[in-house]
Design a protein with these regions (language model features):
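Catalytic cores of phosphodiester-bond hydrolases, prominently lipid phosphodiesterases
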Residues: 1-10, 17-241
């Protein structure tokens, strides 16, 4: 995480697990252990923000239940309780938490950490987290809901991460569709700056073309999607990007 921060990453997709019915485990991605806990992550964030107080960090977070394929299943409600206890007791989060507001800007985030949870951690007023609906659809443009202490807002999500989510298509069709969706959501967001700034957008370039357990599957997607997104942004500079 510290290396990613130094290279310019400011948004993180963290997926904590459970070691038992009451204790948070490490952050995983699917069945892969990152070796980092939520406490570790907060330490990395705090250290970075101390030396870069003008920066802010966004964490998109959800319970990585897929780890439970490797061990007995632990209910989401147990995770919610454990995570709320962690947020309540973690001194770093309590000192750096950014209260969600649908119209917040970077000014409100500087020196702080905003958590957007894909699991409802109500009451959100206790922890200042935001809760968002999510989508893995192979279409974009549907407005979902995001809410917290700062009210209810709209959010647009593009997170089609596999051929399975594209109707079990071929790898080539998935890669083509992924590029199309990334660029389409970029285009949809342009008018927001002028007409309605109270919209949130999460546009994932990540995904895999092939087996979820093969590193080259992710490399294939990155080699296809990342240049397409960059070229689209460069071609539209000055139009809201």
């Amino acid at each position: 995480i510290s290396g990613q921060l130094e290279h310019g990453v400011r948004a993180f997709d963290l997926r904590p697990t459970m070691d038992n019915n009451s204790t948070l485990g490490n952050i995983y991605h699917s069945i892969l252990d990152t070796g980092v806990s939520m406490g570790d992550a907060m330490e990395y964030f705090d250290s970075f923000l101390k030396t870069h107080p003008g920066e802010g960090i966004i964490v998109i977070m959800r319970y990585e239940s897929e780890r439970q394929f490797l061990s007995p299943s632990i209910a989401e409600d147990n995770y919610k309780t454990a995570m709320k206890n962690f947020l309540w007791n973690n001194r770093i989060y309590q000192s750096r938490m950014a209260a969600f507001n649908k119209s917040m800007t970077m000014k409100d985030l500087r020196g702080k950490i905003l958590i957007i949870s894909r699991n409802d951690l109500s009451p959100v007023s206790t922890f200042e987290t935001a809760y968002t609906q999510w989508s893995h659809s192979n279409s974009v443009g549907e407005a979902l809901q995001i809410y917290g202490t700062g009210g209810l807002g709209r959010i647009y999500v593009q997170d089609m991460y596999s051929a399975e989510k594209n109707g079990n298509s071929s790898e080539a069709d998935f890669l083509a569709k992924k590029k199309e969706l990334v660029c389409k959501l970029l285009d949809i967001t342009v008018p927001f700056r002028e007409y309605d700034q109270n919209n949130w957008v999460i546009n994932y370039c990540s995904g895999y073309a092939g087996s979820a357990l093969a590193s080259d599957s992710y490399a294939k997607n990155a080699a296809s999607t990342n240049p397409a997104a960059l070229e689209h942004i460069q071609a539209h500079t000055g139009k809201g990007f």
